[in-house]
From Swiss-Prot:
Function: Catalyzes the synthesis of activated sulfate.
Enzyme Commission no: 2.7.1.25
Family classification: Belongs to the APS kinase family.
Descriptive protein name: Adenylyl-sulfate kinase
Listed Pfam families: APS_kinase (PF01583)
Originating species: Pseudomonas aeruginosa (strain ATCC 15692 / DSM 22644 / CIP 104116 / JCM 14847 / LMG 12228 / 1C / PRS 101 / PAO1)
Coiled coil: none
GO molecular function ontology, one term from the record: ATP binding
Catalytic activity of the protein: adenosine 5'-phosphosulfate + ATP = 3'-phosphoadenylyl sulfate + ADP + H(+)
Length: 196
């Protein structure tokens, strides 16, 4: 086998995973802006790091500053944003990492396509369920206020839809669960529901 042929690798995914002594996965946190995705994702990354797991966090806000900086907020651009994130997550998964994705990803079809691209057996969808009213109350970046005043158009939850996941692997109710409990639940799911 020529390792330079497209799609051919001299080290397979299973070998990479064995070296890292972990099962790779993509933990995809979805929810409204201000729901708590980044907070939970950061706490999860730290908890897994403390368990000596090899992880990488892909935060939608950070990716908008680099990889996706040429995209706006039209439905088409949002779809392309999620496609790019899913492609990067898949590459990191194939490197044997536990990938944590924190992004609004408002459309169910984009989350479905991401799941299919990454592989159903490796994709853990976490719905960070926070009511719009609570997200607006938190509004850490002042985005809801700007959207309500017309300074931001096509803002998810205000004038652009968020399609609630129909069957997420995990639902986190941030009104009743703090980030530490959310992290424990995600790690428990990761330990008991991932293929060997």
């Amino acid at each position: 086998m020529n390792p330079r042929e497209h799609g051919k690798r001299s080290i397979d995914n299973e070998t990479r995973s064995a070296l890292k002594r972990q099962r790779p996965a993509v933990i995809w946190l979805t929810g409204l802006s201000g729901a708590g995705k980044s907070t939970i994702a950061s706490a999860l990354e730290l908890a897994l790091f403390e368990q000596k797991k090899h992880t990488f966090l892909l935060d939608g806000d950070d990716l908008r500053l680099g990889l996706c900086r040429n995209l706006g907020y039209s439905d088409e651009d949002r779809t392309e944003n999620i496609r790019r994130i899913a492609e990067v997550a898949k590459i990191l998964l194939e490197a044997g990492l536990i990938v944590i994705v924190a992004t609004i990803s408002p459309f169910s079809r984009d989350r479905r396509l991401s799941r299919e691209l990454i592989g159903i057996e490796h994709f853990i969808e976490v719905f960070v369920d926070t009511p719009l009213s609570e997200c607006e109350r938190r509004d850490p970046k002042g985005l809801y206020r700007k959207a309500r005043s017309g300074k931001i158009e096509n803002f998810t939850g205000i004038d652009s839809i968020y399609e609630t996941p129909a069957q997420p692997n995990i639902t986190i109710d941030t009104l009743s669960e703090d980030p530490d409990l959310a992290v424990k639940r995600i790690i428990s799911y990761l330990e008991t529901n991932q293929p060997a």
